[in-house]
């Protein structure tokens, strides 16, 4: 056939015309344009946090999920998810409408208001990639020794908290509700344990379990977080002979209050350093069924520990506890005075404030996703966003010579929300981005938390809740009491 004639005398049998690249369809061209404009709409977040989250973590995969050119590729999906976390509403619909509004403003109306494509793209994000990004945000803090709380050593403060999530069969199977609640009347509950850097507030690692999970087993899964020279700081729930030994092997010292043991006296101590400051010994407890080691391995633990016991007297009004004992492996009274150790434990309360920033300010207390797989990704994104904001706070503090723990996390989040749109408009100008970044640091540095040591406020609600009935049976079986505002329960 004449039209199949070879046009190249140098390559006999080869049809040059058939090797031409297939022209792209109008739909493919429009998809590329939409993806490019969506990426530009998220450049504000990238300009703020791109130096904390390297681009190579967000490149499309070679094969498998997020390997094809889509509107929501890997990088776009990540930054859209990030934007969803820091938004005041935090819903999928809000972030999609934000992107659609930007495209409409640019005269490009090809993005649907449906959240289906975005939710499918979120599901394709690999949990291992998010874990690597979180570890990078935690390890990239450059902290001076002068900023460390005690003798230039990093202090890792640990505590646990609870979270709830949508009532779906999958979530209930993974994190069941408490047994005292009727089926259909409660929500899945999760136990979360976090390890935080006391100097920066950054989350170093985390562990999750059901509400029945004790915090000690969750901590033991995170022992690799601790490095030689660190100091472990915890509450009385972490007072454990076994864990002291595991930390000692890693070159990590421990500070926690005494629990489940009778304090030593001057008559039974090894040495008295000062009043209420004693060098003591602990005997290895007898093996028990729920011990973390088999009996043979348990008996190989040291029979005696040499520790330090410090009695702390609380003479400030408003505190329930009047005195307590601190146990520590920091034995040198010259390098670690008793007063410094007591003040370090006093700062342990900061971990409660870190969780408040996550749960109340960033609204992580009630998770949104409906499957365990997405719940874990949602948690990781919350932690990544939290660490990234902590980076901004730490930079602002050093730029303006302020204490990073005195700068407001909520103030930083508010400043970031307002500045995000201006970063988007300045995305093409590096000079303008630097100017906006300086302005953002200035804004964050002005949000200083007042110094209120020893403040005591009861955890009570002043605003009364509405007079709605409590759900005491599944909703489809529940009947509403008429005139509930006038209803009074009869005495038994």
Per-region residue spans from a language model:
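DNA-recognition alpha helix
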Residues: 91-109
